[in-house]
């Protein structure tokens, strides 16, 4: 970390701050200098966090012969090719225009093989027809383009995608045999990236033109390629600077997108990895997506809908545990994403037995947890933001979650298949929200964060109809004894004990720090507080090394 110099005109000398003292000093004195941390407004009114279901389970029946309980989900869409007019439409390579690629299994050339040889104008003509077919009405929904065969950034096409680099270089050499390999490679890179950009950019433009009420974006964008579960002692899941730079270079893509669809799928390596390893990977990937969402306009960020699965990608019959849900869904909610898309393959509904397993998992594990985080997030939004923004971690790296206090709440599944929430929040619960979370205002709203929780008298939030917390705020904690040990609250009681060893990052650009300090200490009526804090730092030897 570089030197932070603060020269106070009244002190007549320069003081250098560092380490813990610098962080404490900044957090105490410069909240007014921070740029407002905005989030995209809800896609659906009164649904601050969107749950979406993107799995082919429409024919599944549960134990009682009834369809799966999807009451917590606001948008639905089956990936099956014959499904149209859905809340979520996912476009694979075989159902959206003439996407050029090489079949990874057979090596067959499809629509020109590489983007430079792809029929762009024919693609757009076909694209128009298929958009109108799959989206007969322009209702509010998600339009997700899943093109994974090649990436628009040349250097990200590593094995086995390096075939696109190889074929691009071969094309240039066939057209210009006089070029040496180095020059041919450089030209191939330029040609490939331009053609890839044209295909992806023009596809988004036409989609937005024809169906403007849908939110358009590409699955897996952005990504930061932090997949190293097997090195928890060496690797903290951070996104490498080079990958952040490459994401920055895709500004044209973020400009044309109206939503981002990153992914936090876990493999079985994550199952055997430490809790922190899984947590780091998900946390950093979502944090990078939120950073990218602000590239087009930091005051009007793009919504982030994070794709997740209920199973491990390479063990499709093994559901995620309670703790895995905390490390995925819990992280996503606490970081302030716009929603989650649960994707699933046909294996979820391949037989009556698999449908029954899914039904049981949803009733006993998934849905109670979704209710828990939904109610906690809505409660925080209501008391902290007056519902004009969403609660996000004050610093993105600590292990603070939007969970109901397990000592005060219990979520019960009744014999009739409906859920009931027992308990009430206390002043201490609300103060914990205020301590660990901040209010990120919705775009174009100048919301004010409540700081005194003593003024909150009641809380009225619902996860779904008749699954609500509608009560007054209790003055002190009263331990609630759940009737059933399957209550989700007690399972969460240990999740906040995880200690993160990652370095805390300042939630604002360092270049603005010294200017903010100068302005505050010039105009603050508490100048001697500034002086005393600086003096304390000097006394205790907090100098930069």
Curated annotation (Swiss-Prot):
Keywords: Cell adhesion, Cell membrane, Disulfide bond, Glycoprotein, Glycosidase, GPI-anchor, Hydrolase, Lipoprotein, Membrane, Signal. Its main location: membrane. InterPro entries: Aldolase_TIM, Glycoside_hydrolase_SF, Hyaluronidase, Hyaluronidase_PH20/Hyal5. Belongs to the glycosyl hydrolase 56 family. It is a lipid-anchor; GPI-anchor. Transmembrane segments: none annotated. It is found in: Cell membrane. This is Hyaluronidase PH-20. It catalyses: Random hydrolysis of (1->4)-linkages between N-acetyl-beta-D-glucosamine and D-glucuronate residues in hyaluronate. The active site is at residue 148. Glycans are attached at residues 82, 180, 372. It comes from the Eukaryota. Pfam families: Glyco_hydro_56. Involved in sperm-egg adhesion. Upon fertilization sperm must first penetrate a layer of cumulus cells that surrounds the egg before reaching the zona pellucida. The cumulus cells are embedded in a matrix containing hyaluronic acid which is formed prior to ovulation. This protein aids in penetrating the layer of cumulus cells by digesting hyaluronic acid. It is an enzyme of class 3 (hydrolase). One of its GO terms (cellular component) is side of membrane. Residues 1-35 form the signal peptide. It comes from Oryctolagus cuniculus. Testis. Disulfide bonds join 60-355, 224-239, 380-391, 385-439, 441-468. The keyword Disulfide bond applies. The lineage of its organism: Eukaryota, Metazoa, Chordata, Craniata, Vertebrata.
């Amino acid at each position: 970390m570089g030197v932070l110099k603060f020269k106070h005109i009244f002190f007549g000398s320069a003081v250098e701050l560092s380490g813990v003292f610098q962080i404490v000093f900044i957090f105490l004195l410069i909240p007014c200098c921070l740029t407002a941390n905005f989030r995209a407004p809800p896609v659906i009114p009164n649904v601050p966090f969107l749950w979406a279901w993107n799995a082919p389970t429409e024919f599944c029946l549960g134990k009682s012969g009834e369809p799966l309980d999807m009451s917590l989900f606001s948008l639905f869409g089956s990936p099956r090719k014959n499904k149209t007019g859905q809340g979520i439409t996912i476009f694979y390579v075989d159902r959206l225009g003439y996407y050029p690629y090489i079949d990874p299994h057979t090596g067959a050339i499809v629509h020109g093989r590489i983007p430079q040889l792809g029929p762009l104008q024919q693609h757009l003509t076909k694209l128009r027809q298929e958009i109108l077919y799959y989206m007969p009405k322009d209702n509010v929904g998600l339009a997700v383009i899943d093109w994974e065969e090649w990436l628009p950034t040349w250097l990200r096409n590593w094995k086995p995608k390096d075939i696109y680099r190889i074929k691009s270089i071969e094309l240039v050499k066939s057209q210009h045999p006089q070029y040496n390999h180095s020059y041919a490679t450089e030209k191939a890179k330029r040609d490939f990236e331009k053609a890839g950009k044209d295909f992806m950019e023009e596809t988004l433009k036409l989609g937005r033109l024809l169906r403007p009420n849908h939110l358009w974006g590409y699955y897996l964008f952005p990504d930061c390629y932090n997949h190293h579960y097997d090195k928890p002692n060496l690797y903290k899941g951070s996104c490498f600077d080079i990958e952040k730079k490459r994401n920055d270079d895709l500004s044209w893509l973020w400009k044309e997108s109206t939503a981002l669809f990153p992914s936090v799928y876990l493999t079985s390596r994550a199952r055997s990895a430490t809790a922190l390893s899984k947590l780091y990977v998900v946390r950093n990937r979502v944090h990078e997506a939120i950073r990218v969402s602000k590239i087009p306009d930091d005051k009007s960020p793009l919504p982030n809908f994070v794709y997740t699965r209920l199973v491990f990608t390479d063990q499709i019959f093994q559901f995620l545990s309670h703790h895995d849900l905390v490390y995925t869904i819990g992280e996503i909610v606490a970081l302030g994403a716009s929603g989650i898309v649960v994707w699933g393959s046909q294996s979820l509904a391949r037989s009556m037995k698999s449908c029954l397993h899914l039904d049981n998992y949803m009733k006993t594990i998934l849905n109670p947890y979704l209710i828990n985080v939904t109610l906690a997030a809505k409660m925080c939004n209501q008391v902290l933001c007056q519902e004009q923004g969403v609660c996000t971690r004050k610093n993105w790296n600590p292990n603070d979650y939007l969970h109901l206090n397990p000592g005060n709440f219990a979520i019960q599944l009744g014999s009739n298949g409906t859920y009931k929430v027992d308990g009430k929040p206390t002043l201490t619960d609300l103060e914990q929200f205020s301590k660990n979370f901040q209010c990120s205002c919705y775009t174009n709203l100048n919301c004010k964060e409540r700081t005194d929780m003593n003024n909150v008298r009641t809380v009225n939030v619902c996860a779904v109809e008749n699954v609500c917390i509608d009560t007054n705020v209790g003055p002190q904690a009263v331990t609630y004894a759940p009737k059933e040990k399957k209550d989700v609250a007690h399972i969460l009681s240990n999740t906040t004990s995880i200690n993160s060893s990652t370095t805390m990052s300042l939630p604002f650009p360092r270049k603005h720090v010294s200017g903010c300090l100068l302005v505050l200490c010039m105009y603050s009526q508490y100048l001697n507080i500034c002086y005393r804090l600086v003096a304390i730092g000097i006394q205790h030897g907090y100098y930069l090394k």
